């Protein structure tokens, strides 16, 4: 009988100990240079953002996309069979709505100062790597220089869009559909493809 009681006590002790070892779920940490893609983490000493800088950038991008979608819904939908002239008219109408809705927008609203520092450090780090000269050559291929741009401006129709080097593109935070990164000179712009509008930009991302 005493032996049975000892077994019961031992079993209860094991159960209690096992329960104590269970870990409580952890909250998801904000995205930073440490949790971003490997390419970003490699240059953590160059332009390292504070906690949540990339997360804040993503949040501001999402806010812009929500606004654009809301405004786009007020326009008549254009069918796939629309003529280039009709598509251009729709694009310009959307740009006008977006520009009016964010009339007070300025450079640095989406790419905030710490994010700008982070982007500059990232791009300069990639260009300083062993494939830097090749990437720079790709970066400058058909890259328009000396072009004036401003937030809420339409991307110039006479200027070809530069090709984004895969190494640079892979290191930057991913963007939602219809938003793209593009270079205009040594400025990295955030382009709304649907409205053909410059959402924001970062100056002097590399030396020319």
Positions of predicted regions on the chain:
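Bacterial N-terminal signal peptides that target proteins for export
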Residues: 1-8
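Bacterial N-terminal signal peptides
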Residues: 8-17
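Short, low-complexity, intrinsically disordered N-terminal modules
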Residues: 17-18, 29
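Bacterial signal peptide processing site
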Residues: 19-23
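Post-signal peptide N-terminal segment of mature Sec-exported envelope proteins
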Residues: 27-52, 56
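Early exported N-terminus immediately downstream of N-terminal targeting peptides
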Residues: 50-114
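Mid-length scaffold segments of soluble, non-membrane domains
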Residues: 89-164
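Amphipathic, charged alpha-helical segments and their helix-to-coil junctions
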Residues: 136-208
């Amino acid at each position: 009988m005493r032996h049975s009681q000892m077994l019961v006590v031992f079993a209860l002790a094991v159960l209690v100990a096992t329960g104590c070892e269970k870990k409580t779920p952890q909250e998801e940490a904000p995205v930073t240079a440490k949790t971003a893609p490997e390419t970003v983490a490699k240059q953590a000493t160059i332009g390292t953002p504070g906690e949540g800088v990339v997360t804040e950038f993503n949040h501001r991008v999402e806010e812009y996309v929500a606004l654009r979608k809301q405004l786009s819904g007020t326009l008549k939908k254009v069918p796939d069979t629309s003529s280039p002239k009709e598509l251009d008219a729709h694009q310009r109408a959307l740009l006008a709505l977006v520009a009016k809705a964010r009339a007070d927008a300025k450079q640095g609203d989406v790419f905030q100062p710490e994010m700008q520092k982070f982007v500059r450090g990232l791009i300069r780090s990639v260009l300083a790597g062993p494939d830097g000269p090749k990437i720079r050559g790709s970066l400058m291929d058909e890259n328009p220089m000396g072009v004036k741009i401003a937030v809420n401006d339409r991307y110039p129709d006479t200027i070809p869009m530069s090709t984004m080097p895969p190494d640079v593109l892979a290191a930057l935070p991913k963007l939602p559909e219809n938003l793209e990164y593009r270079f205009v000179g040594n400025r990295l712009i955030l382009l709304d493809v649907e409205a053909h509008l410059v959402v924001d930009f970062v100056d002097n991302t590399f030396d020319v």
